[in-house]
From Swiss-Prot:
Its cofactor is [2Fe-2S] cluster; Mg(2+). Its EC number is 4.2.1.9. Belongs to the IlvD/Edd family. It holds the Pfam family ILVD_EDD_N. It comes from Salmonella paratyphi C (strain RKS4594). Mg(2+) binds at D81, D123, K124, E491. One of its GO terms (cellular component) is cytosol. HAMAP family: IlvD. This is Dihydroxy-acid dehydratase.
Length: 616
């Protein structure tokens, strides 16, 4: 029988000092036999996805206390990728994931907490907490802040839906008037919550649901809706049950590694491919799998991508649907239900509610459930009122979207595409693979060949795009922006958005060893591995070289002979200490970022730290 971890600090005469300190936090004699549960919050006023979380930790803590546990809250950092984007701040985004994971480990292990409730929402916070949870392997439940309502405004006598990406594209389009750009900017992000499309934050919150570590509805129920409060209340109660099951009944099924096992990771990736999620999810799932000691690699993702169809299309791949529409169509479990009927899921998995996948679908799939409360929950909709307050409205759709032939979520028979929304490409300058969000690629450019325009920083590429130096047919290559080379693996949302604003969204390709925002669409290929700074062949590409992209056949090729590539590699090595570094880039890199870069691996490994360098 496992012993409560917290007993280390609450039992025994030699822990009198620790108990004295616990008493100073409000604990009493009756608390010293109860489980101590960490409420890991991520409130910050910097991030709209987290601005409403201040009081939600207390909400969870009160339920923990009422259910027989002791709740102790702490906070992690949270970077807003959208605000950090387009300048040096983006260098810090991905490294913050490791800091979040480490800070959770530090707090939980330093104070011997028995379990956790993780209150996350945005891009690197959910992955960082997920990595920590699987590293620590103590009972955990995730409950996120929820998606933002889609922006809406009237343009050309038509009401259109908007998000952050629209504001960026219109702001850079010289053909758009200042008045229209300002109108879109003011309408794009109307409420608290994670940005309203299937961007990285919402993708990851959907995936925690598919992994079984969060409750049904977590990935899609709006941040502003009153129904979301119940997820927080339930999390506080349920975590005490899970904790007691493990420590008092020796039930290891309550542990995250036994819930989020390899079968669950395969289901989560299957969901991601089917819903056309962010390419960043590949990076984060690979990293989380390593923390869980699960053998889940790019090869597994490649295999899944070849058999899973695209059953859902959401912004940025279309402006017709946002997360509020996904929720109305049944949310994550609506998509999983269709995948299950197609025979594409592992059914022998459980979630934090203790339900198997078939049991969960029976209760929560809107196409089969008889539970009117579930149907009511999935009718939770937007209010269209600007607010930063959680649970501030209770509007509902008049009906559910259960049209699997022409609705937001499709059945296998009526899939948007027989090929899924993500694909892994391999070739002679991406030997370990690269990722493309096929859900956002127009059919006309699934095969694309063109001359390379090479840039050694995102800034240089943006200047060239806006300066008219990139033309129709070009393949823009941005290198030395990987985990080590950036350092920090910047997102390339500005280059892709500016290609659209210049009318080149369907006329050019963009390839990088960096990564893309979940808001990216178009022929945007990222995560090229090995990266340039690690000796990757992408460092050897020169202006004018022909690059051939063939998404249907999962191929990407630099059309040079092996002899020419070898000669260029030899010339690169001859640069000595300057080998595999940018030639003319001026970038100030802090000590903290250099420390990150010294241990960073390429994207095919999840950009995690190289344990072998530490003897691990």
């Amino acid at each position: 029988m496992p012993k409560y971890r917290s007993a280390t600090t609450t039992h025994g005469r030699n822990m009198a000092g620790a108990r004295a300190l616990w008493r100073a936090t409000g604990m009493t004699d009756s608390d010293f036999g109860k489980p101590i549960i960490a409420v890991v919050n991520s409130f910050t006023q910097f991030v709209p996805g987290h601005v409403h979380l201040r009081d939600l930790g207390k909400l969870v803590a009160e339920q923990i206390e009422a259910s027989g546990g002791v709740a102790k809250e702490f906070n992690t950092i949270a970077v807003d990728d959208g605000i950090a984007m387009g300048h040096g701040g983006m260098l810090y985004s991905l490294p913050s994931r490791e800091l979040i994971a480490d800070s959770v480990e530090y707090m939980v292990n330093a104070h011997c907490a028995d379990a956790m409730v993780c209150i996350s929402n945005c891009d690197k916070i959910t992955p960082g907490m997920l990595m920590a949870s699987l590293r620590l392997n103590i009972p955990v439940i995730f409950v996120s802040g929820g998606p933002m309502e889609a922006g809406k405004t009237k343009l050309s006598d038509q009401i259109i839906k908007l998000d952050l990406v629209d504001a960026m594209i219109q702001g850079a389009d010289p053909k758009v008037s200042d008045d229209q750009s300002n109108q879109v900017e003011r309408s794009a992000c109307p409420t608290c919550g994670s940005c309203s499309g299937m961007f990285t934050a919402n993708s990851m919150n959907c995936l925690t649901e598919a992994l079984g570590l969060s409750q049904p509805g977590n990935g899609s129920l709006l941040a502003t809706h009153a129904d979301r409060k119940q997820l927080f209340l339930n999390a506080g109660k349920r975590i005490v049950e899970l904790t007691k099951r493990y420590y008092e009944q020796n039930d290891e099924s309550a542990l995250p590694r036994n819930i989020a096992n390899k079968a669950a990771f395969e289901n989560a990736m299957t969901l991601d491919i089917a819903m056309g999620g962010s390419t960043n999810t590949v990076l984060h799932l690979l990293a989380a799998a390593q923390e869980a000691e699960i053998d889940f690699t790019m090869s597994d993702i490649d295999k899944l991508s070849r058999k899973v169809p695209q059953l859902c299309k959401v912004a940025p791949s279309t402006q017709k649907y946002h997360m509020e529409d996904v929720h109305r169509a049944g949310g994550v479990l609506g998509i999983l239900g269709e995948l299950d009927r197609a025979g594409l899921l592992n059914r022998n998995v459980k979630n934090v509610l203790g339900l198997t996948l078939p049991q969960t679908l029976e209760q929560y799939d809107i196409t089969v459930t008889q539970d009117e409360a579930v149907k009511k929950m999935f009718r939770a909709g937007p209010a269209g009122i600007r607010t930063t307050q959680a649970f501030s409205q209770d509007c509902r759709w008049d009906s559910l979207d259960d049209d699997r032939a022409a609705g937001c979520i499709r059945s296998l028979e009526y899939a948007y595409s027989k090929d899924g929304g993500l694909a892994v490409l391999y070739g002679n300058f991406a030997e370990n693979g690269c990722i493309v969000k096929t859900a956002g690629v127009d059919d006309s450019i699934l095969k694309f060949t063109g001359p390379a325009k090479v840039y050694e920083s995102q800034d240089e590429a943006v200047e060239a795009i806006l300066g008219g130096k990139v033309v129709e047919g070009d393949v823009v290559v941005i290198r030395y922006e990987g985990p080590k080379g950036g350092p920090g693996m910047q997102e390339m949302l500005y280059p892709t958005s500016f290609l659209k604003s210049m009318g080149l969204g369907k006329a050019c390709a963009l390839i990088t060893d960096g990564r893309f925002s979940g808001g990216t669409s178009g022929l945007s290929i990222g995560h090229v591995s090995p990266e340039a700074a690690s000796g990757g062949t992408i460092a050897l590409i020169e202006d004018g070289d022909t690059i051939a992209i063939d998404i249907p056949n999962r191929s990407i090729q630099l059309q040079l002979s092996e002899a020419e590539i070898a000669a260029r590699r030899e010339a690169q090595e001859a640069r000595g200490d300057k080998a595999w570094t940018p030639k003319n880039r001026q970038r100030q890199v802090s000590f903290a970022l250099r420390a990150y870069a010294s241990l960073a691996t390429s994207a095919d490994k999840g950009a995690v730290r190289d344990k072998s360098k530490l003897g691990g």
